């Protein structure tokens, strides 16, 4: 209903397949639309891992598998995400990052929560121009219950909103950064300079 009220046509494809997402991105690259919404990229990542595990007939991934998984994800999604000439808005589930340290009293190593990250391939969450952490808060004082949400800007390429937090955020909170990043956009058919061959730098 939100898009209908705004007069925006929305095409929906319900899928958790990276192959389907890649096909959709190809169509946008050809001009089918200017904006791609992905909800959520965590589902696509989990489906990608499951498909790989089924292909190699394993129930658990092994260390050497990541030497295939990560480059494939980068080639089939992350590189396109960065290079394609349209806008992408995606969300993902939040998960904890864990680290370990030695307990000075017991001498044993203990695992602890060291931060929060998006549940997706490790580098993917840092590719967007803007990264926002959404959190839900609840406060109960007697019979009075307050619920609100906060958006913390983890990364803002424009630097205008970097590090800011908004309570019950709306689109208006993000307009300054969005306007800054949309200034002087490249045309869809902009010429891309080919990258130099770094391999020539190695002496073998």
Predicted regions and their residues:
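Conserved inter-motif catalytic segment of the P-loop NTP-binding fold
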Residues: 1-75
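Arginine residue identity/basic-tract feature
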Residues: 13, 27-29, 57-60, 75, ...
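Serine/threonine-rich low-complexity intrinsically disordered regions
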Residues: 4, 62-65, 70, 103, ...
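Hydrophobic transmembrane signal anchors and adjacent membrane-proximal interface regions, especially
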Residues: 10, 61, 79, 113, ...
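Interfaces that engage single-stranded nucleic acids at replication/repair/recombination sites
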Residues: 1-5, 11, 16-27, 31, ...
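Low-complexity, flexible helical/coil segments
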Residues: 24-28, 70-79, 128-134, 188-192
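Phosphate-binding/switch region of NTP-binding enzymes
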Residues: 79-174
């Amino acid at each position: 209903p939100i898009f209908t009220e705004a007069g925006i046509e929305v095409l929906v494809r319900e899928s958790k397949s990276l192959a389907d997402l890649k096909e959709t991105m190809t169509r946008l690259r050809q001009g089918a639309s200017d904006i791609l919404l992905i909800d959520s990229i965590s589902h696509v990542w989990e489906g990608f891992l499951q498909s790989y595990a089924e292909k190699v007939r394993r129930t658990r991934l092994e260390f050497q598998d990541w030497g295939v998984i990560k480059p494939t994800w980068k080639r089939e999604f992350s590189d396109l995400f960065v290079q394609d000439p349209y806008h992408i808005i995606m969300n993902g589930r939040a998960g904890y990052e864990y680290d370990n340290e030695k307990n000075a009293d017991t001498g044993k190593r203990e695992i602890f929560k060291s931060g929060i990250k998006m549940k997706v391939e490790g580098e993917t969450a840092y590719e967007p121009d803007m990264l926002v952490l959404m959190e839900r808060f609840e406060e109960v004082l007697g019979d009075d219950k307050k619920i609100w949400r906060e958006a913390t800007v983890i990364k803002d390429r424009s630097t205008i909103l970097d590090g800011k937090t908004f309570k019950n955020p709306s689109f208006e909170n993000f307009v300054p950064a969005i306007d800054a990043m949309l200034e002087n956009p490249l045309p869809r058919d902009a010429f891309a300079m080919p990258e130099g061959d770094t391999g020539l730098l190695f002496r073998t």
